[in-house]
Amino acid sequence: MSDPNLNASHDSVESVEDELDIVEAADAVDPDEAELADAEAGAPAEEAALHVESDEDEDEADVEVDAAVEEAADDAEVAEEEAEEAAPVEPAEPVDPIQALREELRLLPGEWYVIHTYAGYEKRVKANLEQRAVSLNVEEFIYQAEVPEEEIVQIKNGERKNVRQNKLPGYVLVRMDLTNESWGVVRNTPGVTGFVGNAYDPYPLTLDEIVKMLAPEAQEKAAKAAAEEAGLPAPAVKRTIEVLDFEVGDSVTVTDGPFATLQATINEINPDSKKVKGLVEIFGRETPVELSFDQIQKN
């Protein structure tokens, strides 16, 4: 009869020995096989690492290519701009001053009217009207007043000089919207004697008429501006030559009109209107008269 305790002990010993054999077998694995296993295990990881490095290299290469393309584009743009700057600039076509004036006047608000003034008071009327338009709050109706002028050559006592004189003596041009209020402001301006045409419902000038009146000054200004821009002297302009032989205090004979053959003494000369004011003796009394240059002759 066998002892149960001995059998259990024997089984335990065998179990322990089996475990030791397993451990030793594991330790006794061929080194070459281990290295092969390690190599097989590490190959995918190494391949993955190489793939990552390759992607990074490709990204860097793409960035460098993009930078090079952008730099080349910038260089091309700069070169194009420099070429445009270096290219000769074609001179602009000359602008017709009359056509430019016509277009400017056509776009302005209001219409142009002509008012009568006392001779020699044109500039004073212009200044008074501009001041009254502001002080009476009618600037939205009365826009502009103009006294057309021209430059002439005046010869007096042998001395020659250029002077500016009114082109329309006794008249002032006004650009305005005609209302009862604006009409009253203009009509009651000191020095104004009335509107040209219908006194209470005057007719405005046409565009052609106002262009014709203002064109000479516009042409002269355009010619001077073009000469200055080109660095040239102002172009010569044909001037009217006026010989003025009268002086205040001169005794003259009236040659035309109701006072013909009478003697007069000049006390005022107005070159703009080409008129003089003087005293004529009628029935033993001195009477003030206004005479034009062609109505008198120096004694």
UniProtKB/Swiss-Prot annotation:
Residues 30-96 are annotated as: Disordered. Residues 46-87 are annotated as: 4 X 4 AA repeats of E-E-A-A. The N-terminus is blocked. GO terms for biological process: DNA-templated transcription termination; regulation of DNA-templated transcription elongation; transcription antitermination; transcription elongation-coupled chromatin remodeling. It comes from the Bacteria. SMART domains: KOW, NGN. SUPFAM superfamilies: N-utilization substance G protein NusG, N-terminal domain (SSF82679), Translation proteins SH3-like domain (SSF50104). Signal peptide: none annotated. Residues 248-276 form the KOW domain. HAMAP family: NusG. This is Transcription termination/antitermination protein NusG. It comes from Streptomyces virginiae.
